[in-house]
């Protein structure tokens, strides 16, 4: 389902239930990437929009997939990658399985999964 949200043009928001921190609950996010983190755990990298958070307000967050359940692809879409997005995973993600591509100048966003 998350791959479907990322592959859509435009991409869709998702909502899921997360139990990987001290504030379990539903999160709504803009999914950007699925990859392995430094501990080789499969993670969703997403722009956090709403829900409980132990790591502050809106911004990029990583969610370990073993703690993600009840995923729903929402009808609401988003324009594409947020500022600061690193399609190569940056220093904390590797073995990318699915991700948004940064659009080329004067072209629409491309998606790759």
What does each model-found stretch correspond to?
Residues 1-113:
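Core beta-strand-centered patch of the WYL/Sm-like small regulatory domain
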């Amino acid at each position: 389902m998350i791959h479907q949200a990322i592959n859509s043009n435009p991409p869709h928001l998702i909502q899921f239930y997360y139990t990987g921190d001290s504030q379990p609950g539903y999160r709504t996010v803009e999914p950007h990437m699925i990859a392995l983190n430094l501990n080789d755990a499969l993670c969703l990298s997403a722009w956090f929009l709403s829900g409980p958070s132990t790591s502050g307000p809106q911004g990029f967050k990583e969610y370990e997939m073993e703690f993600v359940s009840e995923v729903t692809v929402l009808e609401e879409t988003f324009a594409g990658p947020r500022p600061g997005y690193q399609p190569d995973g940056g220093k904390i993600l590797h073995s990318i399985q699915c991700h948004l591509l940064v659009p080329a100048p004067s072209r629409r966003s491309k998606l790759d999964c």
